[in-house]
Amino acid sequence: MTTARFRQSLLALTIAWLGIVAFATHLLIRAEIGRHERDFEAATQQLSNGLKHKLDTNEAVLAGFVAFLRAVEGNDVESATRYAASATAAYPHIYMLEVARRVSVSEERQFEAALRQNWLADFTLKSFPGITGSPATPAEAKMETWPVLFLYPALPEAQAIYGVRLETVDYLAYSLALAKKNARPVVSPVFELYEGGRAYILLQEVERATAAKGLAATSLFGNTMTALLVIRSDALLPGPAAPAALKTMAYAAQMRSAGRSDNLLFSHEAEPSGRLDTWLLPRFQHEFVIDNVSQPTVLSFEQQLAWHDLLTAEFLIIIGLLACAFVTVPALSLRHFRAVERGARELE
């Protein structure tokens, strides 16, 4: 075999080996990217399932509270407090349970006087703009009003809410109207709490089967009420037990209410990505639609894979072995070629 033939064989072997190593490296990178994509999908599925469980829990707790209000005595605040405490103890994302009752405008003064005598000495019916200092909007004349009469827990910073007419709360007026004669809960837009933070309310009208007479007409719990479940939006965020992958991704949850379709519940921004990450590595995206009856929510996720995520210790070890093989095999082939070439010259 001539020297030229030997060199051609060596070149072909080197190119073939380069192709094999490149293909193996490609498969390794694809496998590692696939593993990260599976971790991404598992983490997003876990967060979606956790949020769905909380939304379903909200409906179940509100349904139980509505059933309780249909049976509670007119002024039995102690029983209502005990029930609210037991119903919300296992669900820290539920911020507050509230009750508002319907009062005829013609009976407002009698109602206020009765509650001052039997409940709160300084009780008064008030408008929401009056306690927040926000501009009041002109209201149409109505035959009824819906003051808030029960809060649990009765937080000191929320005491001003007692007696607030729900229909004067701008973000609740439309939801309150939808809840009337509605067998299903209605969700409000996301809003800023009076005591700070963002929240939304799940509300449902409560109708008693028996009519109230005499003193019952001026009791805390009347014939027609609205049960309200207040949920802080930041409490819906994943807790400490959430997958570590969630810390490196961007995600957002938007709830679709009757009043608005872009209620942002919560969001999380990922750290800025490097240019090499953006150019050379994939960006994972996924969207979940939680078809809750009263709280339909869209969850969107996004994660840019970074080189520091990809270059794990195991990955670097395998890449190192491939690099050694890439250098060693051509070197041994060249050494063998030179030995054969030297032997051929000696034979000549």
Q: What label would you give each PLM region?
A:
Residues 2-34, 317-331:
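Extreme N-terminal signal-anchor transmembrane helix of membrane signaling/transducer proteins, especially
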Residues 3, 238-241, 300-320:
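Membrane-interface helix-start motif
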Residues 7, 118-120, 313-314:
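Intrinsically disordered, low-complexity regulatory regions flanking sensor or DNA-binding modules
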Residues 15-20, 34-38, 53-59, 139-157:
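Short, compositionally biased low-complexity segments
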Residues 29-62, 69-77:
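Membrane-proximal amphipathic alpha-helices
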Residues 33-42, 334-348:
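Cytosolic signal-transmission helices at domain junctions
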Residues 41-45, 70-298:
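Intrinsically disordered, low-complexity polar/acidic regions
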Residues 256-258, 309-315, 320-342:
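Extended mid-to-C-terminal alpha-helical interaction segments
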